[in-house]
Amino acid sequence: MKKIKKLLAVFAAVGVALMLPLQTMAAVDLNAKYDISTNQIQGWPAGPDITSDTGILMYADTGVVLYNKGGDEQRYPASITKIMTLLVAVENSTMDEKVTFTETGVRNVTADSSNIGTKVGEVLTMEDCLHALIIQSANDVAAQIAEHIGGTEQAFIDMMNQRASEIGCTNTHFANSSGLPDDNHYSSARDMALIFREGLKNETFRTVVGTPDYIIQPTNMNSQQRILHTHHPMFAPESGFYYEGCIGGKTGTTVAAGHTLVTGVTRDNTTYIAVTMRGTELSNSCMDSTAMFNYAFENFTKTEVNGGYVFLPKGVELNSLTEKSENTNGKTETGYYFGDYLIGTASVAQATDTPVPEPTAAAEDS
């Protein structure tokens, strides 16, 4: 069944790709500077001045954004691309599948490319591959996953772009499965947060991104264990940047992309996603993300409403919000606004009249 689903996904992605116009080269302006747009909301808590070009802090359950600095501006994602590679992979494979490496993957085993030193003909499980993809950021594994699932790398890339469109990404185009430099490979902080948010709905995705350490056992062509440890400082307890409640994420870096970082944190049943793009150093990206998480936890109160939650700036009362409701598909969807800014949503099933049964003949005779 999983194999049939995978083939259908490939055919659908190829069909969509044929119908879409060719993508033009992205006009990524690396010299542009952006303001913190959420600071312009009257009465909104002032957000931190991060050093990364762009950044966003999103509530995972609803996608509500509490902090936004150029979040819709295109930037090169580098290896945080692999979050989408992981999502498409877990949706179209099983963890016990056998992946045989070909020249497609092994050509990425070079001194200047992150890899796990695979060889042509080597066999790993999909579980091994997915952990190497996220923990080691292995480019050889990314390419091989793409070919294994898509039949060709390009077919898998088409699946990535189709999935991005389905999720609601509007400033993203993928040209490969690894994040290696390509002028036509770009995304935005908001889009990457949306992709990570979608992934968190999948149990296998959550397991892989939430694993800081993994051992690949000896294979048919490698007699040694491969011991993997997270590259994400905010996820590593021994790191000075470790953040309590971190549930994983992904690092990335190239010359053009600078340092990119996706991080998830859960505290008190509240999960936030922070994304920073084009940081100057990984340490600065970690400090930017930490500042955004601290800002959210210190300045907002998660308040329950009928059918959902809103995030109130501390000191703001629920009755000061504006509510806008509409009925769709048997539900009442309500948006809660702080001024004109959406800070929460709720969904409640509409009440229906329960028909009263007519008395039966037996009941009438009793």
Give names to the regions the model predicted.
Residues 4-7, 83, 267:
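Hydrophobic alpha-helical segments, especially transmembrane helices
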Residues 169-170, 181-186, 190-366:
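Domain-terminus/edge residues, biased toward the C-terminal soluble/receptor-binding domains
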